[in-house]
């Protein structure tokens, strides 16, 4: 077992996870298989991964500081929000990976989440204001436009009904460990291809959970409709088929979503976090 991991290992794992997600054909989202037609480019995401990684993995920082510094580095580099959701999910994982306490990654992560402070909330609110994410709106409780007087975990509890990233904070990243990582391992066994496995993870999230970015922007009915469409695509997906045949159905779904302006961004964020967690687990056991 090779832990605790170094800051360099964690930064590299995060950077690689971000790039691997771009290599996956993710219908409706940014990827290398088509034109940059969701308002952001692959190059923006590559730059974001490069500049955010050192801040996310810096030793000795709180979760909130990791979030704020990573988001500020990103906005300063590319001029707009590309990775707020990714950073929100990845910062606690980075803290857990750098923690020298006993236990596995999931157990240490639970302790990190339970220990989130008011200071973490203040740093995170500042990051969200800096990023100016789309579809956020105003919340009746603990709105990010003001200064929080609750811990970050308490703020996430208030948001969990409308935001799946917040839900994962309050449920110890259940989506990542019980859905994402299980599907990733299964898909890797089927295809031995990380991009194909990442596509499978993304589709599993989209088919299993209404995407909350779509829900915030277009309503829950639209998110549920996309979820049903994703279920049909996932049912037809064959990781053992040749790439051309496999991608034909995925590209048709991709074009349909983009023609309607529907970007399942939360599903993509969960996919990056899954790839990051998989790499951290592999590093910890020396694989």
Task: List where the protein language model places each region.
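Phosphate-rich cofactor/ligand-interacting catalytic cores and adjacent structured alpha/beta frameworks
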Residues: 1-61, 97-255, 259, 281-287
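Conserved phosphate/anionic-ligand binding catalytic regions in large, soluble enzymes, centered on
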Residues: 78-92, 260-276
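Amphipathic alpha-helical interaction segments
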Residues: 69, 88-92, 197-204, 271-272
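Long, hydrophobic/aromatic-enriched structural stretches that serve as scaffold segments
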Residues: 54-103
